[in-house]
Structures are given as structure tokens and as C-alpha cells.
Amino acid sequence: MANEVISGEQLQRVIRDAADLVVSSAGVTLGPEGRPVIMSKSYGGPEVTKDGYKVMNQLKPEDEKVAKIVELLNQATSQANEKAGDGTTTATILVGNMIKNAHKHIAAQRSRMKLKSGMKRARDEVVKYIQSVAKKINSEEEIAQVGSISANGNSEIGGKIAEAMNKVGKEGVITVEEGKGLDEFSVSVVQGMVFDRGYVSPYFITNPEKMIVEFDNPYVLLANKKLSSIQPMVPLLETIVRSNRAVVIIAEDVEGEALTSLVLSKMRGSLKACAVKAPGFGDRRSEMLEDIRILTGAKTLVSDDLGVTVESLTVEDLGTAKSIIISKDSTTIVDGGGEKTAIEARVKQIKTQIDKTTSDYDKEKLQERLAKLAGGVAVLKVGGATEVEVKERKDRVEDALHATRAAVEEGIVPGGGATLLSAIAVLEKLSSDDDDEQAGINIVKTALKAPISQIVENAGEDASVITYNLLESKDPNRIFDARELKYVDAFKAGIIDPAKVVRVALESAVSVASVLVTTEALIVDLPTKDNGSSSMMPGGGMGGMGGF
């Protein structure tokens, strides 16, 4: 396939166009007076949202060159969302402003590497500042307050999040599920586990918006070996298909023909499945698979040592769970189908091993297993009158939970873009003997005004006046309330941000902006001429895969 290479001023113009597009599209949603965006969907009616992250992911520019840069800019929002669960729109506005300012310096023939160096020096100083002004939160009451603020003042949501954290610990596993009742909003602790392994292939994803796999009442197939052939699994998988249930395969690895066949079957809609690599290595992997077997109630697992093959399994041998959630980095098993007495016996066995071992390393790993197996999972159940209302409430609770976790982890800072604005004073003291590096510092310094300016503009006020007044006050806790249109104390008014969200938004923005500042060329494929033929996914059954 032929391609096109662009560089120089043409490339800079494409980068500017992409940055302008994402900022103008997502920026309008920022702040309490942010405006909604209507998005057309490939199925169903249009969606109205104030979620900048959703808007960014919906952008599909017709110009292939602009589309590639938009894709790269999306990494800033994805990084912010993955690491902190929020701050995506702030990251977008920051990176857009940095690119806009960097273009002037690139046009003036400044050293791009020195610009990058200055930007990173500025980033490091601002991160130190954010960490220095962050206020730690510890009590259940403070956690409830942060949760309430994160949920736009909903004290019930804040209270339930605090209750859940109190039950399983601040580092414990908390999931949000759809409830059955009209006004249901409850907290319960069930048997469960989370481990640090995600899906083998992103093609298994069932929720593209959150980039996760979600299954209700799935089977769990465990294998302490690599699975590379699909044929031995066909009879079992055909039975699972007829039961209209999903299956999660947790194995040493799933590769080759087995992985390809599972992915294609999932994409065709004939099988709901996901493959996950088993946690740990060697003997430790065997022990963790046994933990999962007991938790899920599986009768056995595939193992050469045990003489158990995939062909010999029936659905009665598989484990079950009320739900399983899988991201690219982790797997959460909620309410496994194992017997409580068997789980308690396993916990007792691990405790005995901890007492007997003399190795600090082994003791640490055993304690990790104990925490995973005995800690349980807190489940927040959210109900509503309609499916739309339940989804909206569930999304709101999940957003508040992410923000609260971030706040518990690194503390809270004044919100509304005020913390980044006050960090300008720190960069005023940061200087470089190299003019080009100083220009890089100034790129970040100028960008720190952008988020609060966008919030103020969305509220219909003059951003230049507001930012000037706040900088002149030299009070880091003084912010502008964009809803009430007045200056207030951030902590007294409850307008705060998790420090982690602000930090990650800045780091993500500088990371992506630095790449674009130093980029010399862009290669895109040229459209191919239509010769009347088309490439299609093969339909019907696949050879050697039975009827699923």
C-alpha cells in the first residue's frame, strides 16, 4: 500500500488543526457550567454528554493525517483516565495549549530537544508543588465528604463510598453493579478476588467505552498450562454456547489457534469468552490457580501433573462467579461460586504457611494471597426507574469512586483549575541559562492558565479578569466558583480536586506534547482505489470449530 510522508510546516499545521479540534470539542464540557455535546451513535439515537473523555473518543476526522494526530492526543486522556479515573478534559486542554504555544517557538527555529527539556523541568516543579499543597484525608467522614463533592454534592453517594471503603479497607476492591430495586443503593461484601492480569487480547472487550470485559454469571475454566489448540475445547465450548453463558479462561497462556478462534468467535457473536493469563510464575502460579479454583467452586483444573485434560472437562467441572470484570491490567472476580467452608479452610492453610515460613519473601507473597482470598469485594448496587437512569446513576457512582480513591491516595487540592494557576508562581522562580530551554518552561507556564480559563469562559465570564484577580491575591485556597460566579475559599466551599487527578493530567499532557514537539514527520497510508472487491470476515462456522 502506498503512503504519504509529511513534515515541516505542513506537519505543524496538521498538529495545530488536530489540537484545535479536540480542545474546541471537549473543552466546552469542562466545569460546572460546561455545555453538553450531542454525539451520533452507530446504533440507537444520539447521545447527549458532558463527558469530555467520551467526546474525545467519538472524534473521527475525515482527514487521515489529522485523525492520526487526534489518535495520539487521545493518549493524554487515556493515560489520565487509566491512572486517575478523571482529569481527561483538563489533560486535553493542557496539551492543546502547549502545542499551540510550542508552534511559535518551532517556527522561530528553536531547538526542539531543548523545548522538551524545559517542559519536563517545568512539569517536575509543578508536580512537587501539587504534592506540597495536597491535604491528606483519613477519616470515614472526610472520605464521605470527598465522595459527595466528587458526585456533585450528592451526600448519599459519598456516604456509601465511605461505608464500602470502611468495610474492605482503602486499598480494598470495590465494584459498582446495577441493582434491581427502584431506589436501591446498597453496600455488601461478597467473596471475591482481584489479581494483576488482564485480557490477552483487546478484541475480547465488551464495553469499549471503559475498555473492559464485563460478564454476569460466567463459567471459569482454569488451566495450569498453555492452551494453543482449539479442537480439544470444542465440545465444552459448544455446551457453554447452548447455555447462553460466558466463559473466562484463566491459563498459563492462551495462544496460536486457540486464541485466534476464541477472538473470531467472540467477534462473530457466537461465543462470549475472554482469555486471561494466570497470575504468578511456577509453583506460585499453581498455588494462585488453586486459590481461584476454590473461590469459584471449580471441581478441577487442567494440568499435566494432575492428568486432567481439556477434553475430559464438562461444564460441571468449571467454576462460576456472579460477575467478572477484566481490564487490560487486572481481573476482578465477584462473588465466586465456591463453598464458604472450603474458602475458610484454604485461608487457614495459608495462615499456617505464613507462620511456618522463614523466608521474608515467601511470607510477603503468602500474605498477598491471603489478602486477595480473605479480603472480599465490596459491591455497590445502584437502582433506578429506567435502564437509562440506572446507567446514568451507575456512571456517576463509578466516577465518584475513582475520584475518591485518588483523593485517599494522594490527598486533595483546591479545584476549579486553581491549583495549576497558583503553580505559575513556582515556575516564575524556575529559570534556565539556555533561551530555548527557558522557552520550554514558558510553554508549560502559559498552559497552566488554560483549564481555569476554559471553566470561566464556559460560565460566560471574562477569563483574563478572573485569572488576574486570583494571581494577584496570592492565596492558593482562593478560587472562582463558576456556578455561583463569586470568589470563595476552596475547602470551605467544597470545590476540590484529588491531587492525583491534577498531577496525572499535567504529566499526561506534557508527555504527549513533548512527543509532538519533537516529531519530524508523519507517515499515512494513501487510500486505495476500489477495484470492486471487498474483504469480509468469513461467515458461518469455521473448520474444526464445531457449531459455535
From Swiss-Prot:
Its EC number is 5.6.1.7. It comes from Neorickettsia sennetsu (Ehrlichia sennetsu). Forms a cylinder of 14 subunits composed of two heptameric rings stacked back-to-back. Interacts with the co-chaperonin GroES. The gene is groEL. It comes from the Bacteria. Together with its co-chaperonin GroES, plays an essential role in assisting protein folding. The GroEL-GroES system forms a nano-cage that allows encapsulation of the non-native substrate proteins and provides a physical environment optimized to promote and accelerate protein folding. CDD domains: GroEL (cd03344). This is Chaperonin GroEL. One of its GO terms (biological process) is protein refolding. Keywords: ATP-binding, Chaperone, Cytoplasm, Isomerase, Nucleotide-binding. It is an enzyme of class 5 (isomerase). ATP binds at T29, L30, G31, P32, K50, D86, G87, T88, T89, T90, G416, D497. Belongs to the chaperonin (HSP60) family. HAMAP family: CH60. It is found in: Cytoplasm. One of its GO terms (cellular component) is cytoplasm.
